[in-house]
Structure formats: C-alpha cells, structure tokens
C-alpha cells in the first residue's frame, strides 16, 4: 500500500471515463445543462489533444433499478428503466460535446436506431482512432448489471489503458471522509489491499473484472476543474488501483 509516493505515473492514450448519473442532475431529477456543459468542455479539451476517450454514464439522475425494486417493482423491469435513463444522459453529453467542436458517437446495448448506433466494439475502436468520443448507453443491455460493470467490460473489450472512475471525492479513503476527518487518502493501492481493507472502489463485479484482467482503475474527483485532463496526462491525483 502506498499513501504518499513520488513515483511518476504515465499518461494514457485510450481511456474509459465512468460518470455517475447523479452528477448530471446536479443533485436533482433530470439533467442540469450547466453540469453537462462543464463536463463536455473538459472532455473536449482533452480529446482535442489526441487522447482517445470512451464514456459510460449512469442513469441515477432518472432511475435506479435497485431502489425501484425496494418499492415493489420487478427488478428486471426497473433495471431496463435505468438503462433508458442512461441513454438520455448520453444524448445530452453528445449534444454538448458537439457544441464544443468534438465529434461524438453514442452506441447503445439496446437497439434504438433512430437515436444511436448499436454497440459494435470494432466500430467503436475506429471512431476512437478517428478522434471521436464514444459514449456507451443502455448499460450492458441486460438487467442485474450495473453501469460500473458496463464501464469495466467495455474498457476491456475496446482496449482501454485505464478505467477512470469520476467521483465527488478525491479518491479512495481508509474511511468515509465526510464523517471521519482522520480518514486517509490512498494515492496507490493494490486490488488485494482493497479487498483486505474492505474499501469501496466500484461494485464487486466491475472490480473483479478489472482485477482479473489487470485493468488499472483511477478514482478521482470530477468536481475539481481540469481533473479529467490531469488524470489522463498522468498527474498524481486521486487513487490508482493497480497490481
């Protein structure tokens, strides 16, 4: 475990950026245009430098399948509602990226040809090579799989160098920093140490996919201006989870 080290990090060429849907809503139901515009601007600035950026967005600002299930809804049906929510977020981000001069394609795991391409990994890779941002919507297209898991699976299939987990905190802590002021921020940690310490990085399925396939995970604070660029360039921000 490393909590403070000056060992340099390398930058990344192709990245998967996982964004929580709650952030798009600014704490409310729906899409906050100012928030989405800010995220789009940061992504556009980095994309114009030659970085290849794929994005997965949650749908928590519209629906959360697990929460709807607790209120008596069928889990599969409520998960599909959540998937549709992610597509609305994808289209919003696509529009704002276009306003910032970046070409973008949305690919969805559920066929909806009038608004997006179907998920085709080889086509997604070609888009990235041509400098387009690719946003993956509708989760895995199947219930019981989170958007964290989608981000991990897509990152592996299209050959990303790292999974960037954008959060509202600075990284992975030894305890909840909101309730424990003495909580320690890890700058580097191994997957084994994450498990031993019971730390929360991503959901269990997503974390296992990354650990088994040696995909690094970088957890960082999206609310700090310029952090997407810093994360991709290799600056020492957030927490790097790597074997």
Swiss-Prot record:
GO MF terms held by the record: ATP binding; UMP kinase activity
Main location: cytoplasm
Catalyzed reaction equations: UMP + ATP = UDP + ADP
SUPFAM superfamilies linked: Carbamate kinase-like
Compartments, record wording: Cytoplasm
Domain of life per record: Bacteria
Cytoplasm keyword on record: yes
Modes of activity regulation: Inhibited by UTP.
Swiss-Prot/TrEMBL keywords: ATP-binding, Cytoplasm, Kinase, Nucleotide-binding, Pyrimidine biosynthesis, Transferase
Gene Ontology terms: biological process: 'de novo' CTP biosynthetic process; UDP biosynthetic process
Residues annotated for UMP binding in this entry: 59, 79, 140-147
Physiological role: Catalyzes the reversible phosphorylation of UMP to UDP.
Family according to the record: Belongs to the UMP kinase family.
Protein name: Uridylate kinase
Taxonomic placement: Bacteria, Bacillati, Actinomycetota, Actinomycetes, Mycobacteriales
């Amino acid at each position: 475990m490393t909590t403070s080290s000056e060992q340099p990090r390398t930058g990344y060429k192709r990245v998967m950026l996982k964004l929580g849907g709650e952030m798009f809503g600014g704490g409310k139901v729906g899409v906050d245009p100012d928030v989405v515009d800010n995220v789009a601007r940061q992504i556009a600035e980095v994309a114009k430098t030659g970085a290849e950026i794929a994005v997965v967005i949650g749908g928590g600002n519209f629906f959360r399948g697990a929460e709807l299930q607790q209120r008596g809804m069928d889990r599969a049906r409520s998960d599909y509602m959540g998937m549709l929510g992610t597509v609305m977020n994808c289209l919003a981000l696509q529009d704002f990226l276009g306003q910032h001069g970046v070409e973008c394609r949305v690919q969805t795991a559920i066929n909806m040809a009038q608004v997006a391409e179907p998920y085709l990994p080889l086509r997604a890779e070609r888009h990235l090579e041509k400098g387009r941002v690719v946003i993956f919507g509708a989760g895995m297209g199947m219930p019981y799989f989170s958007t964290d898991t989608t981000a991990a699976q897509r990152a592996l299939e299209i050959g990303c160098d790292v999974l960037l987990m954008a959060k509202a905190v600075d990284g992975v802590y030894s305890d909840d920093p909101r309730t424990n002021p003495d909580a320690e921020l890890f700058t580097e940690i191994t997957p084994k140490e994450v498990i031993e310490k019971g730390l929360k990085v991503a959901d269990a399925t997503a974390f296992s996919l990354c650990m088994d396939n040696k995909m690094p995970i970088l957890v960082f604070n999206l609310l700090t201006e310029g952090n997407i660029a810093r994360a991709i360039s290799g600056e020492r921000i957030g927490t790097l989870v790597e074997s």
